[in-house]
């Protein structure tokens, strides 16, 4: 504390003046070394010294391994009882669309009704006025994913044969019964791709076979399969029984032989879209691209010292359990023969809108087990201590001696200390001869206290002795003030681009607009004659942006025309805006461990600290109970980004995780190098989202061979991650070969860019019109930007299916055109078909190596001062310093009063006389 305390040195048994922990002796002549006095209180603290320089940071520690899997969580509550299955109704005629009502419970699909004849073409109305946006709806709670099913073996892919001729349409056949599901064959080598054959017509969908009830559970908790039975009335779900102990997985059965491929039959007419097929397995991963140049390593200046981190937060709950396997789906029937095309009839009457029958709501799934918590990584190496700061200013000067306190009680006799230095001999008189010993008197009363002598002059401090052994480490004191922040380090070389961040949170839906008014109906025009083929003109210059037109009112949909003949494929349109971000998929398995970076240069070694003896290890405390889940905290303010460190070599990319929902559209990222395919590991627990990393440099990877794999099963939706940083725009690809000259069309009128219209109400579906003539003309000028996404309109009447023309051979790839302006979101498409049954989930792969440790985050604010620490234990006494200069001789105090008489002394020795008797008495002479 700005000075040294020599109070532990042996002091002579003489009067002492106390001053702030320092003792000044008043000599009374040379004598033997006295007892060691008690330790004085600590001196006043000196001013704090300036901040020392920060030492270089230590190397990061190796990442830890993943811990064992956690215990399975408790079973969830039983599901709700389903309703009664509704009867299977006939399909009604399409009615006029009403206002969208509440969605009813879905019933069984009804039988398809007879297809009506197309009606006359309706008059196209004026567009209606845009409505105001409504209030956004609340996002519903997300359900828990079920248990994941086991993955089946991959089927073999045979060689692609030559394309067969297009057969004539055959008569429609009856739907066949669902055949037995064949065994999956072994994985074969991918054969060479044959020439692309003409596209066959799509057959009519077969009637799905009835789904049988689930089979009894197999031995050791394995899921069994029962025979497909007729659907019965669903009873109320029972309480979930105790979970069985999963038994060992049996060996895979022998794979049956693959049947011969029959002759291709005649192609049937194009029917309605069939059910969604089961997803195939993923194809092999392409070879890794060539690595870019390794960045040069530059050592920046040392950053400011980081605060000591507190205890880590509790790990997030693990991933949900696996979903059970789904039942078998019925096989589609054989395509029927195409019947003769009927004559167009009169438009049918509009029937009432069909209602959905009541369906059975499924029982709620039980929550899966909590995944394993990640193991704590190994501690990093201890950094080198920084250079010692300059010494602080010395403490205040020694104060004047205070008044002497009352004398304390006598201490016990201590061991004799080492003799002090010989003092200067005073002017002492000669000593006379010793007198006879007198009787020992009683101790007299204590004399009055003499006045304190003047403090002697301060001696010159001697050289410091060797430091003694360090005492035991005291308890931790309150934290000191934070040091000054050091200068920012130089920006290091740019590191390789990191993997894309998780998808951002899904935005809330926009406000629903108010209904607009319908405009007056316009007159229907007659189709004009087919124009002659014009000569294609040269590419015109881009015109200036026109004035924004007034917002038109939304018109009613005109009558739907019959599908025309298939035209030549047009040029690819501009890429639309990305959809709103869906929920992110679960964290993919960790990629293989990257190669270690170059070891940093060793910083200057600091002075060696004094090593204290190790304290006794404390007993581990009892494991605390798990607390309740607290409310979600708000995101804190992002601190300043620290300096970018030097880039190590980039590790290979890990295998792709399950696909998450579509996120917000960012600019196209840079194409990274494909990493070597690692073995897929089990999904680890979702980590805490870190701050966004710096954007990586633009790299261009070599294009790998096109893999042809079957589509893998979709994984369960993962947790929503924060929006990752936008990558730099990618480089344009090489130009392709020129395509064939397309048919010429009539020149289109260049329209002004339309204004971005508001979302309109769903229009009324018109009647189906006759197919119009196929126009031929050059492609028209580019239209304006897409408008906002509109509400889904009602489904119109299905027109008659036109004859499908033969597909022409694919032409060579044309030269890639200039990148167009990104279009706005187009109108929302019609809702898709029924969701297919989930495919069987794949098995967990081997656990991947942990990824590299990310850069350290910005320095957080200083924490609150802790409570003051307890006094440390007494340290070991230091080495004995040299004796100080002898103080001046004090003045003698006044004599005390005479003491009381002492006790009688012992009898003296005999004087040599003799005894004699006289008149009966004895006398001694």
Curated annotation (Swiss-Prot):
Modified residues (5-hydroxylysine): 103
PTM remark: Prolines at the third position of the tripeptide repeating unit (G-X-Y) are hydroxylated in some or all of the chains.
Region listing for Disordered, in residue ranges: 1-925
InterPro entries reported for this sequence: Collagen (IPR008160), Collagen_superfamily (IPR050149)
Signal peptide: none
This protein's UniProt keywords: Extinct organism protein, Extracellular matrix, Glycoprotein, Hydroxylation, Secreted
Pro residues: compositionally biased ranges: 897-907
Tissue expression pattern: Expressed in bones.
Pfam families linked to this entry: Collagen
Broad class of where this protein is predominantly found: secreted
CC terms in the record's Gene Ontology section: extracellular matrix; extracellular space
Listed Low complexity bias regions: 35-74, 154-171, 281-291, 363-379, 479-496, 508-518, 551-595, 602-622, 640-650, 671-680, 719-753, 761-771, 791-806
Comp. bias regions, Basic and acidic residues: 623-632, 816-827
Entry-listed glycosylation sites: 103
Modification 4-hydroxyproline, positions: 10, 13, 42, 48, 317, 332, 335
Compositional bias per record (Gly residues), positions renumbered to this chain: 22-34, 271-280, 306-315, 423-432, 519-528, 660-669, 696-718, 772-782
Localization per record: Secreted; Secreted, Extracellular space; Secreted, Extracellular space, Extracellular matrix
Known partners and oligomeric status: Trimers of one alpha 2(I) and two alpha 1(I) chains. Interacts (via C-terminus) with TMEM131 (via PapD-L domain); the interaction is direct and is involved in assembly and TRAPPIII ER-to-Golgi transport complex-dependent secretion of collagen.
Record family assignment: Belongs to the fibrillar collagen family.
Function: Type I collagen is a member of group I collagen (fibrillar forming collagen).
Record's miscellaneous remark: These protein fragments were extracted from an ancient mandible bone collected in Haiti.
Name of the protein in question: Collagen alpha-2(I) chain
């Amino acid at each position: 504390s700005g000075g040294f305390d020599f109070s532990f040195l042996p002091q002579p048994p003489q009067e002492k003046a106390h001053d702030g922990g320092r003792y000044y002796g008043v000599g009374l002549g040379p004598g033997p070394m006295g007892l060691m006095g008690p330790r004085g209180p600590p001196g006043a603290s000196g001013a704090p010294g300036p901040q020392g320089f920060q030492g270089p940071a230590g190397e990061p520690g190796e990442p830890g391994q993943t811990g064992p899997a956690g215990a399975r969580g408790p079973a969830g509550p039983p599901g709700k009882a389903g309703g009664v299955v509704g009867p299977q109704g006939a399909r009604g005629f399409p009615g006029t669309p009403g206002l969208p009502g509440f969605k009813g419970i879905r019933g069984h699909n009804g039988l398809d009704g007879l297809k009506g004849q197309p009606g006359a073409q309706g008059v196209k109305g004026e567009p209606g006025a845009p409505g105001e946006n409504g209030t956004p709806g609340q996002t519903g709670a997300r359900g828990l994913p079920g248990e994941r099913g086991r993955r089946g073996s991959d089927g073999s892919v045979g060689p692609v044969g030559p394309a067969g001729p297009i057969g004539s349409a055959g008569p429609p056949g009856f739907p066949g019964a669902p055949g037995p599901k064949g065994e999956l064959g072994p994985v074969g080598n991918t054969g060479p791709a044959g020439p692309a054959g003409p596209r066959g017509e799509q057959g009519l969908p077969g009637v799905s076979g009835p789904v049988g009830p689930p089979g009894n559970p197999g031995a050791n908790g394995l899921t069994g399969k029962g025979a497909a039975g007729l659907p019965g009335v669903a009873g109320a779900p029972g309480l979930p029984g105790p979970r069985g102990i999963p038994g060992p997985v049996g060996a895979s059965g022998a794979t049956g032989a693959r049947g011969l491929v029959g002759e291709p039959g005649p192609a049937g007419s194009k029917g309605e879209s069939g059910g969604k097929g089961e997803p195939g397995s993923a194809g092999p991963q392409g070879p890794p691209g060539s690595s870019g140049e390794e960045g040069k390593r530059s050592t920046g200046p040392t950053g400011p010292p980081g605060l000591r981190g507190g205890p880590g937060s509790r790990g997030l709950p693990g991933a949900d359990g696996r979903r059970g396997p789904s039942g078998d789906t019925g096989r589609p029937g054989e395509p029927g023969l195409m019947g003769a095309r009927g004559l167009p009839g009169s438009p049918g009457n509009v029937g009432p809108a069909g209602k959905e029958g009541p369906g059975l709501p499924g029982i709620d799934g039980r929550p899966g087990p909590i995944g394993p918590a990640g193991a704590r990584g190994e501690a990093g190496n201890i950094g080198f201590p920084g250079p010692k700061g300059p010494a602080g200013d010395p403490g205040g000067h020694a104060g004047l001696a205070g008044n002497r306190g009352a004398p304390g009680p006598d201490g016990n006799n201590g061991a004799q200390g080492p003799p002090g230095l010989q003092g200067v001999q005073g002017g002492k008189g000669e000593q006379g001869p010793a007198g006879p010993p007198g009787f020992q008197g009683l101790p007299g009363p204590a004399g009055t206290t003499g006045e304190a002598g003047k403090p002697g002059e301060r001696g010159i401090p001697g050289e410091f002795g060797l430091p003694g052994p360090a005492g035991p480490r005291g308890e931790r004191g309150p934290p000191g003030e934070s040091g000054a922040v050091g200068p920012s380090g130089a920006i290091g070389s740019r590191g390789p681009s990191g993997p894309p961040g998780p998808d951002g949170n899904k935005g809330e839906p926009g406000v629903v607009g108010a209904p607009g008014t319908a405009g007056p109906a316009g007159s229907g025009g007659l189709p004009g004659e087919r124009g002659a083929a014009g000569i294609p003109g040269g590419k015109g210059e881009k015109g200036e942006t026109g004035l924004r037109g007034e917002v038109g009112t939304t018109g009613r949909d005109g009558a739907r025309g019959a599908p025309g003949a298939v035209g030549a494929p047009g040029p690819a349109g501009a890429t639309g805006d990305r959809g709103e971000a869906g929920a992110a998929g679960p964290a993919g398995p960790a990629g293989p461990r990257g190669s270690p970076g170059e070891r940093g240069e060793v910083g200057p070694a600091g002075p060696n600290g004094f090593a204290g003896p190790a304290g006794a290890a404390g007993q581990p405390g009892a494991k605390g109970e798990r607390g309740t889940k607290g409310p979600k905290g708000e995101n804190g303010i992002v601190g300043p980004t620290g300096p970018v460190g030097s880039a190590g070599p980039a590790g290979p990319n890990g295998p792709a995780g399950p696909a998450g929902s579509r996120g917000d559209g960012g600019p196209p990222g840079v194409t990274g190098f494909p990493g070597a395919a690692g073995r897929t590991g089990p999904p680890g627990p979702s980590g805490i989202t870190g701050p966004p990393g710096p954007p990586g440099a633009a790299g261009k990877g070599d294009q790998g061979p096109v893999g042809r794999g079957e589509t893998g099963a979709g994984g369960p939706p993962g947790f929503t991650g924060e929006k990752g940083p936008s990558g730099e725009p990618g480089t344009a690809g090489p130009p392709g070969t020129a395509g064939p000259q397309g048919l010429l069309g009539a020149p289109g009128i260049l329209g002004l860019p339309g204004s971005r219209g508001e979302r309109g109400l769903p229009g009324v579906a018109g009647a189906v019109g006759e197919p119009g003539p196929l126009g031929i003309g050059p492609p028209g000028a580019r239209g304006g930007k897409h408008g906002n996404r509109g509400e889904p309109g009602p489904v119109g009447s299905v027109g008659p299916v036109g004859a499908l023309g033969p597909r022409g051979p694919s032409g060579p790839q044309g030269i890639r055109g200039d990148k167009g302006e990104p279009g706005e979101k187009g109108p929302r498409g019609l809702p898709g078909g029924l969701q297919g049954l989930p495919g069987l989930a794949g098995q967990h792969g081997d656990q991947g190596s942990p990824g590299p440790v990310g850069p350290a985050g910005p320095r957080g604010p200083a924490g609150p001062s802790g409570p003051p620490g307890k006094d440390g234990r007494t340290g070991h006494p230091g080495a004995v310093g040299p004796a100080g200069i002898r103080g001046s001789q004090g003045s003698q105090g006044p004599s005390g009063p005479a003491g009381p008489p002492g006790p009688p002394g012992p009898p003296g020795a005999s004087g040599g006389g003799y005894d004699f008797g006289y008149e009966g008495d004895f006398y001694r002479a």
